[in-house]
Structure formats: C-alpha cells, structure tokens
Amino acid sequence: MKKAILMMTFGSPEEIIFEGVADFFTNIRRGVRPQDHEIQTLYDNYVRIGGTPLQKITRQEVALVEARLGSEYSVYFANKFSSPFIPDVIGQMEADGIEQCICLILEPHYSFYSVMGYEKFLESKQIQFLVIKDWYQEEALLNYWADEIAKILKEEVKQDSFKVIFSAHSVPIFALDFGDPYIDQIFENSKLVAEKLGLSSEQYTNTWQSESDIGIPWIKPDVLEYLREQTEHPDHYIFVPISFISEHIEVLFDNDVECYDLCQEFGVNYHRPPMPNTDSRLIDALVNTVRVNENQEFKEFLPEEETFDELVPSDETKNILAESQDLQMPEFVKKLIEKKGRENVKMPYLIKKMLEKAGKLPKE
C-alpha cells in the first residue's frame, strides 16, 4: 500500500505585486475580491518586510522531514490559499497511486476556525486520510521555545526587568463559544514553556494578534492593545508568537514592525526569539508527530460533516448576538452570498444569525 505525508500551510502571495497580493487575498476571502484599499494595505505590509520567506522555508521543512522518514513515505506539500493548492496536490497523489495519507498541518494547535479550513479540501475516492489534529505538546518543540527564550534572558535581559508575551493568532469569539480547543491549547502551551523556564505568573502573559477586520468580535487582548494599556513597562519585552513555526508576514510585520514600533515609543527593549523554521528541533517534533500518529485509523474523509454548521451553538453564543447590537455583517460574507447563493455557502452559526438579522437570509 502506497503511503504519503501531506504537509500543509496557509500560503502566501506568489508575487509581491499588487495583483499577486490581490489574488492571494481573494482566495482568503473565498473568491470575493477585497476592496482596493484593503489590498493596498496588505501589499504595503509585504513591501515593508521585503516579501515573505514562508514558501521557501516550508519547502525546506518538507525536504528535511522527507529525508528523515526515508522511502517509507512520499512527502507532498500544499497550501490552503496559494499554489500548490490542496485539491491539486491530492489529484497528483491519486495519479501517483497513493492510498493512505497522513495530513500534517504546519500549525501546532487545533482550531475549528483555521485547521478545519484545511480539512474541507480533503476529498478523494481513492485515498484514506489521517488528520493529525495538534502537536504543540511535542517535547522537542517545547524545548526549542524554552531554549531560545532562555538565551535572550541570559544574554540580553540579564538582571533587568522583563515580561515574556506569548502571542497567538486570534480567532473570532464564536469559535470559543463552539468549544474550540484552540484557546486552551495556547494557554497550556505557554504554561508548559514558562514552567521549563521557571517563570512566575507575573513574568509572562498571553495575548492575541493578527485579527482580521471583518466586522465580528475576536478573542482579546490583542497584543498591541495590551501594550498600550500598560501603565508601567519593564525594561524588556520578549515576544513569543507561539502559534507559528515559520517566519511570515504575521511575525515579520505584526511582531517585528508593529510591536517593535510600540516598544520604541515606550522606551522598552524589543526581543523575539527566532522562529523554528528549519531548526533540527522542529524537524524532530514533526517526525515524532508522524511516528506517534501513524498507526491510527485512516478513513475516507467527509469534509461536509466537519463544518461549523454541524456544531451545536451554546447559549453563550446566542447571548453574544443578542447583546452586540453594533455587530456588522462581514462585507466578504455579504458578497459571497450574493455571488454563490445561500445554499452554496457554509458559515458559522453566529454569522448566519447576523445575516438573518440584516435581512439577507430567511429566519429558520
């Protein structure tokens, strides 16, 4: 039986030109082109950081994992929102005669909001899939973060005051209200690293970053808001974007530009440990994740059964809708409905109710 590993990541623009960024942004918005001023802002951010190394780094990670696993598995690489797209790579896997595939998403934590977006593309009449849900507890990855933070504390901070700020990509608040495990996983991940470093609860905190402006509430505190709200600052802030493993715009701009600029404004030293990228400790974590999971059951994947629409909303979610009269329906969702029709659009409960409230959908 021919087996494969499919390593997947978010993707990035294929060219750092306006239309290249527009194409990528349109894919993120499910085929609805954002407004030009939104595209311009994202394009300017990419230009500010000199482009993105994400695709190069990810391909190197894939090659290193493949070399470690040997001939036992064929290793493939796909993106969610840029080429090579997941459905195209699955088509190539079918042509290569693959029958079983372990899906390794290059995001250590599991979220309905993000990881489920990969799962919906896993369709094949030939291939059975095994999706690794999360791998943030891998000891090699925990040691990586602890070791790199320890270097900063020893070589840069020394005896000065400091705070370690663990940050993770934010998710809409409705994901939490559906029982999304992501938030608890981030807190646990941060605590595990902090314990390895011997940090007290006063020496570290959790924040969120990189939320999208789509008119719905996100998990707080946002890292920039957190910095602005502090009445006193330590000598050093150490930013640890723990939900990511590779350098890309949400680290190189959101942390290294926006957080750095605020630190400059407040007279605080900015630090960020290097991302794992192709470090051997990350490769150890990825390979061990495969080994730990490879004997689990493979199955024909049914992504239509793995959507938000299948999840039962909590009373808390309904209360958010009732109490948030100022919620605005995301513009891209309105455009998507108009373009594809309601019957062809899967959406979370909260957004569905927002559409009904706006008179765009018949009430259930």
Swiss-Prot record:
<feature type="binding site">
    <location>
        <position position="169"/>
    </location>
    <ligand>
        <name>Fe(2+)</name>
    </ligand>
</feature>
<comment type="function">
    <text>Involved in coproporphyrin-dependent heme b biosynthesis. Catalyzes the insertion of ferrous iron into coproporphyrin III to form Fe-coproporphyrin III.</text>
</comment>
<comment type="pathway">
    <text>Porphyrin-containing compound metabolism; protoheme biosynthesis.</text>
</comment>
<feature type="binding site">
    <location>
        <position position="29"/>
    </location>
    <ligand>
        <name>Fe-coproporphyrin III</name>
    </ligand>
</feature>
<keyword id="KW-0408">Iron</keyword>
<keyword id="KW-0627">Porphyrin biosynthesis</keyword>
<dbReference type="GO" id="GO:0046872">
    <property type="term" value="F:metal ion binding"/>
</dbReference>
<dbReference type="InterPro" id="IPR019772">
    <property type="entry name" value="Ferrochelatase_AS"/>
</dbReference>
<comment type="similarity">
    <text>Belongs to the ferrochelatase family.</text>
</comment>
<keyword id="KW-0479">Metal-binding</keyword>
<dbReference type="InterPro" id="IPR033644">
    <property type="entry name" value="Ferrochelatase_C"/>
</dbReference>
<dbReference type="Pfam" id="PF00762">
    <property type="entry name" value="Ferrochelatase"/>
</dbReference>
<keyword id="KW-0963">Cytoplasm</keyword>
<feature type="binding site">
    <location>
        <position position="118"/>
    </location>
    <ligand>
        <name>Fe-coproporphyrin III</name>
    </ligand>
</feature>
<dbReference type="InterPro" id="IPR001015">
    <property type="entry name" value="Ferrochelatase"/>
</dbReference>
<keyword id="KW-0350">Heme biosynthesis</keyword>
<dbReference type="InterPro" id="IPR033659">
    <property type="entry name" value="Ferrochelatase_N"/>
</dbReference>
<dbReference type="GO" id="GO:0006783">
    <property type="term" value="P:heme biosynthetic process"/>
</dbReference>
<dbReference type="GO" id="GO:0004325">
    <property type="term" value="F:ferrochelatase activity"/>
</dbReference>
<keyword id="KW-0456">Lyase</keyword>
<protein>
    <recommendedName>
        <fullName>Coproporphyrin III ferrochelatase</fullName>
        <ecNumber>4.99.1.9</ecNumber>
    </recommendedName>
</protein>
<dbReference type="GO" id="GO:0005737">
    <property type="term" value="C:cytoplasm"/>
</dbReference>
<feature type="binding site">
    <location>
        <position position="250"/>
    </location>
    <ligand>
        <name>Fe(2+)</name>
    </ligand>
</feature>
